[in-house]
Amino acid sequence: MNIIPCSIKTLKGLYDISGVEVGQHFYWQIGGFQIHAQVLITSWVVITILLGSVLIAVRNPQTIPTDGQNFFEYILEFIRDLSKTQIGEEYGPWVPFIGTMFLFIFVSNWSGALLPWKIIELPHGELAAPTNDINTTVALALLTSAAYFYAGLSKKGLSYFEKYIKPTPILLPINILEDFTKPLSLSFRLFGNILADELVVVVLVSLVPLVVPIPVMFLGLFTSGIQALIFATLAAAYIGESMEGHH
C-alpha cells in the first residue's frame, strides 16, 4: 500500500491551501516575506475586543458576580461543560484551548456582520472577518491537529500510535488519512460558511438595500455562532478521542 506517498500528498495539499486567494489582498512586505495584512488587522481587532471586554468585566471582581463578571463566568461554565462532555474527566488543562478557539471564532464570525469593515479603504482588497480567509481557518485547524496529537502522545507516549492498527492492521491507511482529513474538513467548513454568509449579505444589500437583508443578517449571526460551537465541539471531541484511543 502506498501509505507514505499518500500521506505526503495530503500534507502538501493542506499546506498549499494556505496559498489560496479569494479576491484581492493587501500585503505588508517585511524582509523577504509578504504578510497578509487584512487578516492580521482584523484578527488584532478581534483579539483587542476579547481582551478589552474581559479586562473591563473583571476589573473589580466580586464574590457575588454581577453584570459583566456574571456574563463571563457563565461563558466559562459553558466552555467547561462542553470540554468535560467531549474530553472526559481530564478536561481541565484543555479548557483554555477550547475556550480560546470558541471565543476567537465566535467574535470573528460576528465581526463580519456587526463591524463596518467595508468603510475602511485599503490600497487593495477590503477588510472582512478573519474567518472569511482560508489562511485563518487552516491555521486554526492545524492548531487543533497539533493539540490532538499532543494530547494522545502526552497521555500514552509512543503507544499512542498503536491506534492506527486497531481493530485490524488492514485499516492502517484509513486511520492515517483520517488524522489528515480532520483539519481539512474543519477549515473548509468554517471558511465556506462564513464566506457564503458574507457574500449573500453583500449581494442582497446591493440589490435590495433596505429591508430584505436584515433577516438574512440575523440568520447569519445565528449560523456564525453555530459554526463556532461546532468547531470547538469537534476540537474537544478529537482531543478526547486521542486520549481515550477509540473511534
From Swiss-Prot:
Keyword Thylakoid tagged: yes
SUPFAM superfamilies assigned to the protein according to its UniProt record, in alphabetical order: F1F0 ATP synthase subunit A
A GO-annotated cellular component: chloroplast thylakoid membrane
Subcellular location: Plastid, Chloroplast thylakoid membrane
InterPro entries: ATP_syn_F0_a_bact/chloroplast (IPR045082), ATP_synth_F0_asu (IPR000568), ATP_synth_F0_asu_AS (IPR023011), F0_ATP_A_sf (IPR035908)
Main location: plastid
Pfam families, per database record: ATP-synt_A (PF00119)
Keyword set, alphabetical order: ATP synthesis, CF(0), Chloroplast, Hydrogen ion transport, Ion transport, Membrane, Plastid, Thylakoid, Transmembrane, Transmembrane helix, Transport
Highest rank taxon of the organism: Eukaryota
Function: Key component of the proton channel; it plays a direct role in the translocation of protons across the membrane.
Protein name (database record): ATP synthase subunit a, chloroplastic
Organism listed in the record: Brachypodium distachyon
